[in-house]
Amino acid sequence: MVEFTVAGVPCLGLNGGPAFKHSEAFSFQIATDDQHETDRYWNAIVGNGGQESACGWCKDKWGVNWQITPRVLTEAMAAGGDEAKRAFDAMMGMKKIDVAAIKAARRG
């Protein structure tokens, strides 16, 4: 067992051995307030041996998956209807989430 902290949240991990690989079935999600914060987390993960993926997902150098999710995207999806569809469609073309583009999509 190993205890660690992620973004101020205490976590507990267990080494399951080589039979248990990291996958997208598990990820950490960090909710961000703006583009600066989104960029800071994204660049810290991807810029240190990580890998970009689609729709705000990335993988760190140890193969752990992360979702860097601006709150504006979560709010747009929760709004439902056309606003959610426009935000979803915009997100589908992104790797790192572009906050300004999501805001523009919300407005239509």
What are these regions (language model features)?
Residues V2-S53, K59-G108:
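Glyoxalase I/VOC metalloenzyme domain signal
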